[in-house]
Swiss-Prot record:
Modified residues (Phosphoserine): S41, S85, S88, S96, S123, S143, S147, S149, S211, S224, S272, S275, S333, S336
Alphabetized InterPro entries for the sequence: Chibby_fam
Keyword Phosphoprotein attributed: yes
Pfam family, one: Chibby
Basic and acidic residues bias spans: 218-232, 277-290
Gene: Cby2
Keyword terms of this UniProt record: Coiled coil, Phosphoprotein
GO cellular component, as recorded: cytoplasmic vesicle
Protein name per Swiss-Prot or TrEMBL: Protein chibby homolog 2
Family: Belongs to the chibby family. SPERT subfamily.
Subunit structure: Homodimer. Binds to NEK1.
């Protein structure tokens, strides 16, 4: 039922003054046989409604029927004839002058009509035309003369709830992202600390190794295998890798120098041997055992001519250099004094430095591969740090944007509230101002 059919159902939306008179009708007393006097009385309430907005007053008699006229009246308890009904129609209207000439004319809200104000959407804000001005729909104040329908309130409530839900979801996602960034930052800090510790240890080991490089190369060649074994057994994985890499490099250098020296000695020995063969083509059998310390590249006839006691001074010098070379090889490969007369052990002793060199080269290649992998991991770590820094900047920008949005909302709310209060105060001032020639005064411009 519309508000015109049952106007008192929407009494909370009407802004008027109501005066009620109760008329009581008494009937004549009836005398019964039992000498009892009975009199009947009927109360009729009369309401005179005086609206506040310059409308005509009208008289309203309450309904005397007990049948409900609307859904709200049907839900109320049934009353007797003596109790006044609270629903009626306007029975009579009479014209008269408005009680307050300064009041404005009747609006649609005063007539209890369904009124949907015009709306305009600018960017993501909705504005409503209310009381002669455009007001933001999310933060506007309800006017006492404006009573929108229930569907309008329902839609507005749902819009506000949807906006709040979106803001909550956005804040939740930002919190989750911030938490993930914090965890990633903690992990990166831990990795940075570990890398710093490794770098300090690497510096210490490099300084220790540089101090050890002052010792002679031959002494290092003889003790390199034992030092490598001890380091692999005692030091941790990282230290052992770095130490073995450095030791292998030093051993490779020493072995290269040793091979160059041996090649030079072998070239000199071959030249002297060719010159001796031209002088004496035959060799004595007593000088064969002295050939045990030479490498397989040298023949037995060459060694016999170098070790003759009655040879020329050049051959004696060559024999001295070969003996020194033999001692260096024996120190590098180990003592072999008992096996000097056999050819098989001499071959194994001469092949040991080459085998050691091959193993060292293999270890060096493996360590180079590990170093390359570590460098790739370091590059990936730097890339992750850069991404983390970019994420932190984006998170900071989002946080500042949300902060500015909240500040803008607060400013808009305060401005609308202040303007609404100023308008209410202006209207109250107009109400207290005296009338001049029964004309409405002009309103000053809004601040």
């Amino acid at each position: 039922m519309s508000p015109l059919e049952c106007s008192e159902c929407f009494g909370d939306q009407l802004m008027h003054r109501t005066y009620t008179w109760h008329l009581t009708l008494h009937s004549r007393p009836n005398f019964t046989r039992k000498r009892e006097i009975r009199s009947e009385s009927l109360e009729i309430p009369i309401n005179v409604i005086l609206p506040q907005r310059g409308t005509e007053p009208f008289l309203r008699l309450h309904n005397l029927y007990t049948t409900p006229r609307c859904s709200r009246q049907a839900a109320m308890p049934r009353i007797s004839r003596r109790v006044a009904s609270q629903h009626s129609y306007p029975l009579n209207r009479f014209s008269s002058m408005p009680f307050d000439p300064m009041e404005r004319p009747t609006s649609q809200a005063d007539l209890e009509l369904d009124y949907n104000p015009p709306r305009v959407q600018l960017s993501d804000e909705m504005f409503v035309f209310q009381d002669g001005r455009w007001v933001n729909e999310s933060c506007r104040l309800q006017s006492p003369y404006f009573s929108p329908s229930s569907s309008f309130h329902h839609k507005l409530h749902h819009k506000r709830m949807a906006k709040e839900y979106l803001l909550q979801e956005e804040n939740k996602s930002l919190r989750d992202e911030n938490r993930a960034l914090r965890d990633e930052n903690k992990a990166l800090r831990k990795e940075n600390k570990i890398l710093q510790v490794f770098w300090e240890e690497h510096k210490v080991t490099l300084g220790h190794e540089e101090s050890q490089t002052s010792s002679p190369l031959l002494h290092k060649d003889t003790t390199s295998q034992e030092v490598v074994k001890k380091d692999n057994a005692t030091l941790p994985a990282q230290r052992s890798k770095e130490n073995t890499l450095q030791f292998i490099r030093e051993e490779n250098r020493a072995l290269q120098q040793l091979l160059e020296q041996r090649q030079a000695y072998w070239a000199q020995a071959e030249e002297s041997a060719t010159s001796a063969e031209e002088g004496k083509p035959t060799s004595s059998p007593k000088e064969e055992p002295h050939n045990s310390g030479l490498l397989p590249d040298q023949s037995t006839s060459h060694s016999s001519h170098f070790e003759e006691p009655k040879a020329s001074p050049t051959t004696q010098e060559d024999s001295k250099t070969l003996r020194a070379l033999r001692e260096m090889v024996t120190n590098l490969s180990g003592p072999s004094g008992e096996e000097e007369g056999k050819a098989g052990p001499n071959l194994t002793d001469s092949a040991q430095p080459l085998q050691l060199l091959r193993e060292m080269n293999q270890a060096l290649q493996a360590l180079r591969e590990e170093n390359r992998l570590l460098q790739e991991e370091n590059r990936a770590l730097h890339a992750m740090r850069e991404e983390h820094r970019v994420f932190q900047e984006e998170n900071k920008a989002l946080w500042e944007n949300n902060k500015l949005k909240l500040q803008q909302r607060l400013v808009i709310d305060t401005v609308t509230e202040v303007t609404a209060r100023m308008e209410m105060l202006i209207e109250e001032l107009y109400a207290f101002m005296p009338a001049k020639n029964n004309k409405d005064p002009k309103k000053p411009s809004r601040v």
